[in-house]
Amino acid sequence: MASTNGETDQVLVEEKSSVRIFKLNRTKQLNAISAAMTSRLLELFLACAEDSSVKLIIVKGKGRAFCAGGDVAAVVRDIKRGSWKSVADFSRKEYTMNYVIATYSKPMVSILNGIVMGAGAGVSIHGRFRIATENSLFAMPETALGLFPDNGASYFLSRLPGFFGEYVGLTGSRLDGAEMLACGLATHFVQSNKLPMLEEALIKANSSDPSVISSIIGEFSQIPNLKKNSAYHRRGRLQRRKTIGSLPQFSH
């Protein structure tokens, strides 16, 4: 797992029995995914996949964000400098990492206790277990930048109920933890004060059996109530508007 100091600092690794915990560590940038972070995460995922002593991966963020997305500022800087190859290399590694996570041979638990947007979704939503909390805030805000939801969003958004995924992708609508659970972006909802106990239980279990892991998470999870003004309550109306074919009506 050789890497530069910069890459190592941006992803902290804890070894707890058969569990490996990857902690995103760019707190000043809300853990935005950088080229160095992408390289390090990809290296770690590939190494752990081949390590028979590793049974479970836990991914979380340090500070108040899980991951606020890709490091757009660095990408813009490279483009202005004419460093298109750097941008292409970053994107290639990032999308490769998304694929590795989506096809990973070992269970992965993403603890989404805070902001999870854009590339942050790519490093978490493709995993088997996604835990939302009362602090979770999800969005795919790329459309506001003149882009489109990437990092595999065309896969996971298209599988949300009705046309809710299209709505989230088109509008960049922000979802809280309860909405993430309701629409399927999260598999579980756990109050943040229970997360340390959950981690300890997962470590103590020493298991790679998805049913065992799901059962453990279930012991700490709950089904929260949606807000009265939640966009998810309007999913039936969104479906009717999409059928009519009016994009402005569908988006508002």
Predicted regions and their residues:
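Conserved CoA-thioester-binding segment of acyl-CoA-metabolizing enzymes
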Residues: M1-K60, Y99
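Hydrophobic/aromatic residues within transmembrane alpha-helices
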Residues: V59, D71, V123-S124, E179-M180
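Glycine- (often His-adjacent) and acidic-residue-rich active-site loop
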Residues: G61-T96, A144-G146
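Glycine-rich beta-to-alpha active-site loop
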Residues: I101-L145, Y167-G177
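Gly/Pro- and small hydrophobic-enriched strand-loop and loop-to-helix capping segments
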Residues: G127-D150, G184-E199
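Hydrophobic, secondary-structure "cap" segments at the distal end of domains
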Residues: S154-F163, G245
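Loop-centered beta-sheet repeat module
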Residues: L160-N206
